[in-house]
């Protein structure tokens, strides 16, 4: 697997990333860093390239220009699918639509990757799967099938499944956007707990208050560009770009709080602690 000898501390590094589909330029020179143990949120309007960035990190999309590094691996130089599979053992990906196998039980959905990908024997794989289900408060649904679960429960199982290969990094792609509002909180609680345990996470999300609460760094994207990035406090309380401020005014304008203006601080107070339902 292609690698680089780098003293950089960042777990993920993107430099000058360009990606086009035909004449449609989707990414236009993306630079992004994720330090080990950080939670990084990518926010911005729909169609701004957020989810595309995540797919580039895992090698699901091939860029035309720029470099992608995960640990010591140069993702943009991986030519064989076997090399990309090795990378994906280290990078968990939780999708918007769960992507659970509908014909397998919850437990079997978690056992299959450790057995097929890591070669772990069934007894140990099942033991690990049950421990991960307990971690997301879904152990009581081990024998259920995805169709018998709520959207929030399915997404919690999907998060547990992403942990089965013991990844260094988990990518979350708008994992609450398809959920009923009443089940969003249970998924956010699990993500919050992972960040508190030191799991490196990159989130594409429209949950602005949650992003501000958990993120070490926030990137605001539009039209395939990083418009602004900085700490959560800086982006949400003191955005320097008027476009970032306008986006946040729109996203948070119905909350009753004073709308942000570039360079003018505001506070997101009383952020709720989401409860976890079963």
Residue ranges and their predicted role:
Residues 1, 14, 46, 62, ...:
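Intrinsically disordered, low-complexity regions
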Residues 7-223, 227-232:
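ABC family nucleotide-binding domain
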Residues 222, 233-277:
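C-terminal boundary and immediately downstream tail of ABC-type ATPase nucleotide-binding domains
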Residues 1-6, 244:
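Pre-NBD coupling/linker segments of ABC/ABC-like ATPases
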